[in-house]
Amino acid sequence: MKQKYLTFLCFYLIFNIAIFSQIVNEGTLQIEPSTTVYFGDEYTNKSAATHNNDGDLYLNNNFINNGITTSVSGTTSFKSSVNAIQTISGTANTANFYNLEVDNTLMGVSITDSFGLFVENAVSLTAGDLRLVGEAQLIQVNNIPNSGSGKLLRDQQGVSTTTAYNFWSSPVNNSGTFSLNGGLFDGTDAIINSFTPQQVLFNSGSPYNGVPATVVGGNVTTPLTISTQWLYTNPAASGWNSINQSTGLAPGEGYIMKGTGAANQNFVFKGTPNNGNYSFTIASAQSLLIGNPYPSALDSWQFITDNLGVFDQIEFWVDGGSPSHYTADYLGGYAIRNLTTGVAPSVISSIDGLGGASGTIPERHIAVGQSFIVEATGAGTSIVFNNAQRTFITEGSGASVFYKNSSSKITKEVNSFIRIGYEDPEGFHRQLALGFLPNSPADMKYNRGYDAIMSGPREDELFYIIENDLTKKYVIQGVGAFEDAVEFPLGLIIEEEGVHTIMLDAVENFDKNVYLKDVVLDTIYNLSTANFIPNLPTGEYLDRFKLVFKPKEEMLVVDDVVLEKTINVYYNKNNSIIINKPSELKLNNVLIFNMLGQQLVKVTANLLSESQISIPFQFKKGMYLVLIESEEGKKTYKIVN
């Protein structure tokens, strides 16, 4: 049979019309207001074409958009009783409607993976379901309730092990709230049974583990099972609260849940798509588990900006391979995101994909189904989600992350960033981020929303010190445009003896060397070429180290102006360091360091009145630094043995 085509080059439809042939728009298709059009067969909007529907368009088949779609009024209705599944797809990867109606009496409308469906106004699921496949997303603009008996279905995956927590929030509701029993479905066979997933099962007994689905011939015969032992919410005033599968959760309310033990586990959320404004009340110093309430990505920058009077950073739990249900065995930490950038959590660096520069840095956009912790640090008490915070960004792009075991991609930003790493003797890797943001209000002072405080500090830590406030440990510092003369103070706390390492994790849009300055030794180390391993006794070093970008004429320089009185320091043939000084000059300490900044000798006795001090020194041949501290100041000398 010969296929029929109808091609529009430039066509304005202003009367009621029904067309039953394959339709291709190669120019401009304008459907005027108060005009009703029926397309019986598949409709393609080609790459150079523009589709404008301000009337009522009824589609009995698929819609393929390779071009531009616009709409300021009207309704696009996918209406069919003969085509079980109608699809929306195309190389444009997006489509724009004013109102969307699904009126398919068989199954519904399927949105292809990684496709963004933008709806200015209402979504009416009159009959049939709207299936967002994979990373497809629905983005709405107006604050208007969605309606209809049909449901939206959306996939999401998490950490699949039975001992690891995922932090979830639902993009859908059923009669205003979401419960797992009725809203969460088994997506194991979603590729085959996209519209008909089975409700997940639940257990509550020992050994308190979830169970993967039973699959025969690619089809789920027994759905996956979730252990209710590990279901919790964290309301602001209550701390962690145990819930069950029937607990109703408000849109945007977060919950945590452990996995099934499957190699990969896909879940399907099913319900009315969330849309519009949602709010939560919180008091000062309270923490709250909330999450992305929408079936689209959430722009964390806009979300934080809108709520900056309440909180100034958000925290994402990242599991690091917890081996059991015992709290003491939990591995992982909280990644942090603010208006400057994000940093990975402090976890053991040997854990694959975690703890490094490319592991689990939170990107700007929060994935569908992802929840997070906020803490009220401002005077405000109301946290608001709204449609202006929604955006279309897929996880596959690397700009949106849902926290599971695999590492995320890193996307380039227009600002410049430096990521400093610190590893303690136990192998925990802490990352600090410094952002140069020339078009922001951030400066060298504390800037709310741009500077982030460390979450869950350990005994051994490296952190930024801002405005000489020693009560706070910062992991993110945002400033203005880059200036090579500016220095950034660092705090280092050493509680455990062993190897402590400071390193350069990564730079983004930055082509200068990064140096660590030891103020005590007046020494500079190039972190761009090698790690720095201090050999220091336990203690707090809050005024010794700085991050700098301007090297001196030599990497190691002696300060010759602090002490006015003459001191002579040299190494003699008897394997001793000799210090000749005026007898009236009283010394407090003599410290000897190698060229890595490691302290080798400390002398405090017999320094008061002697004019000559002899210090036994039997170390391998090389150059060393002798730091002399007195009542008049301090001075560093170089010696060669």
Question: What residue spans do the PLM features occupy?
Answer:
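N-terminal exported-region signature
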Residues: 23-381, 387-388, 395-397
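Residue-level signal for pocket-adjacent positions within structured domains
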Residues: 18, 83, 112, 562-564
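Bacterial Sec-dependent N-terminal signal peptides
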Residues: 1-26, 557-559, 636
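Prokaryotic Sec-type signal peptides and long signal-anchor helices
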Residues: 12-15, 19, 82, 101, ...
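Generic beta-structure capping elements
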Residues: 3, 11, 79-81, 595
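Compositionally biased Ser/Thr/Gly- and acidic/asparagine-rich
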Residues: 234-250, 256-610, 617-621, 630, ...
